[in-house]
A protein has these predicted regions:
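Short S/T/G/P-rich N-terminal loop/turn motif that feeds into the first structured element of a domain
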Residues: 1-82, 90-94, 124-135
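Short, Lys/Arg-rich amphipathic alpha-helical interaction segments
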Residues: 86-88, 93-135
Length: 135
């Protein structure tokens, strides 16, 4: 499973409508041991996270929620996750700017070192529809 987006995925994100905040749903599965002797996969990811959170906040974004993934209720139980994180950015452009910065790319090495697999889903708000509101 890929740890980074492929070119087509990155281009699709860049070309998507960018008129509202975007929330990134992160599903994270850590390696038992990080590559390169960085301790556990979670330790390596925490090194990435310290830099990434600061960069998110510099762009007007925020971590909305983070928690342990306790149980797969629906789906393949072999596809378990260790952590779920929701990060909101004011726009897709803010996210794309962040991930193209040299400091981010350097920190991303720790992310790659610590993750066994991940899913990153770009989401836009639809709560008004769930409440029976407009479109």
């Amino acid at each position: 499973m890929a740890i980074t987006p492929n070119e087509a995925q990155f281009l699709a994100l860049a070309e998507a409508p960018d008129d509202q905040p975007v929330t990134m749903l992160n599903l994270l599965k850590y390696k038992e041991r990080a590559d390169g002797g960085e301790g556990s996969g979670e330790d390596a990811y925490a090194q990435y996270g310290a830099t990434a959170v600061a960069m998110v906040e510099e762009r007007g974004g925020k971590v909305l929620w983070a928690g342990r993934a306790d149980q797969i209720l629906i789906g393949d139980p072999d596809e378990d996750w260790d952590q779920v994180v929701l990060v909101q950015y004011p726009s897709r452009a803010a996210f794309l700017d962040m991930v193209s910065q040299p400091d981010y790319l350097k920190a991303h090495e720790h992310r790659e070192s610590g993750l066994e697999r991940t899913v990153l889903v770009a989401c836009t708000e639809a709560m008004s529809r769930l409440r029976g509101g407009g479109s």
